From Swiss-Prot:
Origin species: Mus musculus (Mouse)
Membrane topology, as annotated: Lipid-anchor
Name of the protein in question: Nucleotide-binding oligomerization domain-containing protein 2
Residues noted as binding ADP in the record, renumbered to the chain: T219, Y232, T233, G282, S283, G284, K285, S286, T287, H583
Presence of keyword Hydrolase: no
Compartments where found: Cell membrane; Basolateral cell membrane; Cytoplasm; Mitochondrion
GO biological process terms held by the UniProt record: activation of immune response; adaptive immune response; biosynthetic process of antibacterial peptides active against Gram-positive bacteria; canonical NF-kappaB signal transduction; cellular response to lipopolysaccharide; cellular response to muramyl dipeptide; cellular response to peptidoglycan; defense response
Amino acid sequence: MRSSCCDMCSQEEFQAQRSQLVALLISGSLEGFESILDWLLSWDVLSREDYEGLSLPGQPLSHSARRLLDTVWNKGVWGCQKLLEAVQEAQANSHTFELYGSWDTHSLHPTRDLQSHRPAIVRRLYNHVEAMLELAREGGFLSQYECEEIRLPIFTSSQRARRLLDLAAVKANGLAAFLLQHVRELPAPLPLPYEAAECQKFISKLRTMVLTQSRFLSTYDGSENLCLEDIYTENILELQTEVGTAGALQKSPAILGLEDLFDTHGHLNRDADTILVVGEAGSGKSTLLQRLHLLWATGRSFQEFLFIFPFSCRQLQCVAKPLSLRTLLFEHCCWPDVAQDDVFQFLLDHPDRVLLTFDGLDEFKFRFTDRERHCSPIDPTSVQTLLFNLLQGNLLKNACKVLTSRPDAVSALLRKFVRTELQLKGFSEEGIQLYLRKHHREPGVADRLIQLIQATSALHGLCHLPVFSWMVSRCHRELLLQNRGFPTTSTDMYLLILQHFLLHASPPDSSPLGLGPGLLQSRLSTLLHLGHLALRGLAMSCYVFSAQQLQAAQVDSDDISLGFLVRAQSSVPGSKAPLEFLHITFQCFFAAFYLAVSADTSVASLKHLFSCGRLGSSLLGRLLPNLCIQGSRVKKGSEAALLQKAEPHNLQITAAFLAGLLSQQHRDLLAACQVSERVLLQRQARARSCLAHSLREHFHSIPPAVPGETKSMHAMPGFIWLIRSLYEMQEEQLAQEAVRRLDIGHLKLTFCRVGPAECAALAFVLQHLQRPVALQLDYNSVGDVGVEQLRPCLGVCTALYLRDNNISDRGARTLVECALRCEQLQKLALFNNKLTDACACSMAKLLAHKQNFLSLRVGNNHITAAGAEVLAQGLKSNTSLKFLGFWGNSVGDKGTQALAEVVADHQNLKWLSLVGNNIGSMGAEALALMLEKNKSLEELCLEENHICDEGVYSLAEGLKRNSTLKFLKLSNNGITYRGAEALLQALSRNSAILEVWLRGNTFSLEEIQTLSSRDARLLL
């Protein structure tokens, strides 16, 4: 970018590159931008008034950059060229600045000389501002108040130097002459601070520390250390953008690699510093950060950062004492052995070379707020205030911060301070296979596991989350030895891993073959101790446990030896390392296990798992309402009291596990845990009735349909977790009862984070609907495996909307196979996915053989002319289709000709979209011939092509002989006034046309006014 921008010579070229220049000016730190201003001021490109307007504190950097471009533009070619020179000078900041030109310490114009030599003087003052302030104050040139204003801790050393020079420019008491004389006497600037031995020593120590922490992966396993380098597998990392910002041709979210994390595209707030990575529990967020740390520490990537400071939110919340930014970085991450002040000052002066990572905001018990502002890097404050001000940019502005979290913990307020949001969606199909092959290099083992997973639909759906792939890997022997009864639900998987750990801890000669009564009874006390610890931890938002907390829960060394508790990295140097569960989901599982089997758990107290007061009107606030005993009071310290305090997203996971444990399938296991038959039946019956009742209550809250429209339901927050809980119980009769009276025509589940596992749960419940429904699952993570999981419920679907779901040709073929057997399924929307010509045969078969099919939308995929030709053959045999969407593909003229030839004779097609398909005049000519013959088409969308005037001439001729088309859309097609004139002539003979869209074509303002006045149907 730099070379292309710096080659510009005219104002027109300068203006054409404006967006690149803005990106260049804001790509570095505020220090870099202010250095550019120094050069422009020293060359008199900027007046003092210009400079002050561009240096207003608190202005977003992007705003200042645009104002600077406007200012130099108004100064002509010379100003534009000088800006580019200033950018080059500021970027070449590694050389030693020298005071240049004549230098008269007794100059008659000291203020002018200070300005002429400003870049060099700022650099020379860098390490001497404090000394210069003292000299100036003692000499009577500055007041104490003025010195304190310059010393404010929010300013860097360079900014303090600039403020001193700015003050000298307006004071008439000789300060400018004083500075000229004393700056000349200062020693030449030292090499840049990060080249100094002290900084290099700290960087080396920091790299070593980060490398030590990131080399081995022990997130899910305490019994062995796995080398991250050997087993790391890329996850699906998608860039989240605001829906609709890219118009009709908006593509699916970009899938990025880890190395793309800091790219400049997809900004939600360009002036923010924080990159947010969201993902469900077990999707691999912590491992992704660990990989980032490893790549930096080994020098293979992210070397634009000199410093990386990694933090865990679950450990930060354990810090009780007030702390400053300096304390956080040095005492809670890495301590500089020498020159602590110099190192810290460098961090403040060069925040753009610093990266801070904060893992697991969802495990931070304090909710984000912007009410308490803290801008001092040296004054102590609470840990939550420090973290929140770092994320907002009030501290270490322009330092990059990467934050991970589960989605539910991210508020709209926090998103205001997010520069880029990315979603971690777990493994792709290829990722699952690669992960298992990396874990099992023995001949044939990985192949057998992969075959087992692919043959077991429910297990396949679970494995897209890395935590489940890890479980499958750990339990591969148990899975491969089983001939039936493979895990179906999340609860099944966690019971399988429980069995694996129990068997591993048992003597070899006494180990039973499965998770039988004897195995559970032998370690029941351990499981209850772990469950009690887990439940109390959830109540206090505590995920790292001290020795005192372990003792209070009666967890001893024998319990720890089972392997579910592992050592956490100590957040306080020198203290004994605390323990944590392998993963937050294990903590939730053990809490649910405790609630299911503990003799202390009353039936009434289970209600509080689902009706935590803070959930308000959400799903969980209405779940299990009839468990409440009127007039009962919550006993302090009881399970009910503990559950009232737990975080909602952890309650959701715990609720699903509890439903699974109370299922009929696991009744014998709970009985083996010494739960009486009567108590067990009570808990199961209550859970079943309340789950069904809660879902009905959820459905009853749906407002009535608008007269003349289908009754629609948009899922409320938490609805998916209610469905998951029903699925975990695996009782068909319960699912049937839950939806028996649901009376809707459209079920909308957009942006609900629906993956393959959620698809299985939805299908399990929705297959029992009494009336057909249109199912909308846009903007989720269904994928090909999720499509497979939806099979059971497709028979009750009239329409299926799967926009932006990472579906490939394989998933499309599955859908077609089902649609051909499902009489009621009449509409498919698969735009913004990964379809290619390879699925065209299936689509053609669907059109040819399903004569009640109404709508097929496959826009924004990767279909070419070859695919369009195949699909056209299927359309030739179809008589029912009304809507065909092909926008955003690459069918070109050849594909358009094939489609047009078939559409010409179609008797029912009402709407055809070929937006953005690289269609030229030949394709337009074919469409014109189609218009002459077709008697049904009402809307033809051809925006974003290159039809131009020649193509419009053909279309105009077609319009003269057409009497049904109402809307013709030709925006952004390179059409001139001559083409519009041809359309006007056609319109004079066509009264059926209501609108012709011509926006974005090559008309002058006068031509637009003329054309609009001649026919109002032209939309310009």
